[in-house]
Amino acid sequence: MDAAWRGGVGCSPVCLDLCVGLSPVREPSAARHELLDRPAGCRGGGDSKSMTNDEAKIVEAKVTQMSEENRRLTEVIARLYGGQIPRLGLDGSASPPRPVSPLSGKKRSRESMETANSCDANSNRHQGGDADHAESFAADDGTCRRIKVSRVCRRIDPSDTSLVVKDGYQWRKYGQKVTRDNPSPRAYFRCAFAPSCPVKKKVQRSAEDSSLLVATYEGEHNHPHPSPRAGELPAAAGGAGGSLPCSISINSSGPTITLDLTKNGGAVQVVEAAHPPPPPDLKEVCREVASPEFRTALVEQMASALTSDPKFTGALAAAILQKLPEF
């Protein structure tokens, strides 16, 4: 304690009142009131021991009061904090925020700046090129409408793996792959006149019948059909009809000529009569082959050969199914 208090010299008391506005839990002792109500000159005249006891009681009362106030404040703060946790969506299981490295922060800022610049450039380009975009879209629409897709079925030997469909045009193979819905691979061809000719062809065996070869054509040729070389006219006709065997006889005032189309390779075999006539005129033969009568006879002969083929019905049904749209 202070020396002035020990010596009994009268002096002004030290005020230790730390009231913070909350009501005390209990009233201070009567000794404290009595000591505080005494005049300043009369406090130092008592016994030193009794004064020390009174001061100790006063300090104890103040400490008890402050402890109770602290306890009340702690309860109020805990109650307020507990009420704010549900509103802020915080809970004890939330993981602490991970530290962000400066490199990732720089990278994110750089990406955000690039995104902003690209958005500005796109907006300017969009404002300046609406007309061009509309024209190009219309042109693309027209191109899509002009694309023609057709399918052709050919019956082949199941052991043949060449995936070649002879249609009179020259093609260049540029790829082959296996599709998901068909175990047979699909071959991709371009017209030999590419890139000026945009026609493409896809050839693949039918998934239902391995003896059917399905060729899908995309686009139209912008060049005339290549003229067949000598001796390939019947081969082209046979390829258009599915390479079916047929024989045609032409009866005219001239010598009798038989065209045998049953030979493999499509070669024309001229069979002379029993009495060999004089050599025929080549121009006359070509004129007869190009005549409408020859074409009519060829069509009739091919039709009869198709109807007599037991597999023709199955091939025709498969071709019709290929043409029908998928529902």
From Swiss-Prot:
Naturally occurring in which organism (per UniProt): Oryza sativa subsp. japonica
Domain notes: The WRKY domain is required to bind DNA.
Name of the protein in question: WRKY transcription factor WRKY76
Top-rank taxon, per record: Eukaryota
Region (Disordered): 87-135
MF annotations from Gene Ontology: DNA-binding transcription factor activity; sequence-specific DNA binding
One Gene Ontology term from the biological process aspect of the record: response to chitin
Coiled coil (residue ranges): 56-76
Feature: DNA-binding region: 160-226
